């Protein structure tokens, strides 16, 4: 699947983007490169292969080194909220933006 300059123009219009001719050409090259990679991946025969839930699951000998989940800095909530125009029960209040 290869995109045309018209496809890029339509995508840019749908995304409300205004692309210069150079940006449009670069986008065309990048997207066609991406679709080329996807086509190569689709060409690989994966029949009979069990899907992996996680790539590391294929290698049983790897021991993940996860650190302890601990706070590394003191709680600065009150100090950070002093400059806020409105705070309620420890949360920043913001104006409603969606009707």
From Swiss-Prot:
SUPFAM superfamilies: Glu-tRNAGln amidotransferase C subunit
Entries under Pfam families matching the protein: GatC (PF02686)
Keyword annotations: ATP-binding, Ligase, Nucleotide-binding, Protein biosynthesis
Catalytic activity as recorded in UniProt: L-glutamyl-tRNA(Gln) + L-glutamine + ATP + H2O = L-glutaminyl-tRNA(Gln) + L-glutamate + ADP + phosphate + H(+); L-aspartyl-tRNA(Asn) + L-glutamine + ATP + H2O = L-asparaginyl-tRNA(Asn) + L-glutamate + ADP + phosphate + 2 H(+)
Domain of life: Bacteria
InterPro entries: Asp/Glu-ADT_sf_sub_c, GatC
Enzyme Commission identifier(s): 6.3.5.-
Enzyme class: ligase
Gene Ontology MF annotations: asparaginyl-tRNA synthase (glutamine-hydrolyzing) activity; ATP binding; glutaminyl-tRNA synthase (glutamine-hydrolyzing) activity
Gene Ontology BP, a term: regulation of translational fidelity
Subunit and partners: Heterotrimer of A, B and C subunits.
Family listed: Belongs to the GatC family.
Role according to the record: Allows the formation of correctly charged Asn-tRNA(Asn) or Gln-tRNA(Gln) through the transamidation of misacylated Asp-tRNA(Asn) or Glu-tRNA(Gln) in organisms which lack either or both of asparaginyl-tRNA or glutaminyl-tRNA synthetases. The reaction takes place in the presence of glutamine and ATP through an activated phospho-Asp-tRNA(Asn) or phospho-Glu-tRNA(Gln).
The protein's name in its UniProt record: Aspartyl/glutamyl-tRNA(Asn/Gln) amidotransferase subunit C
Organism for this UniProt entry: Paracidovorax citrulli (strain AAC00-1) (Acidovorax citrulli)
């Amino acid at each position: 699947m290869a995109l045309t300059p018209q496809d890029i123009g339509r995508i840019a219009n749908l995304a409300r983007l205004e692309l210069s001719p150079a940006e449009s050409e670069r986008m065309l090259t990048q997207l066609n490169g991406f679709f080329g990679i996807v086509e190569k991946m689709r060409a690989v025969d994966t029949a009979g292969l069990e899907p992996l839930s996680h790539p590391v699951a294929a290698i049983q000998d790897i021991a993940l080194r996860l650190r302890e989940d601990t706070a590394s800095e003191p709680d600065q909530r009150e100090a950070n909220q002093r400059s806020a125009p409105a705070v309620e029960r420890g949360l920043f209040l913001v104006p409603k933006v969606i009707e």
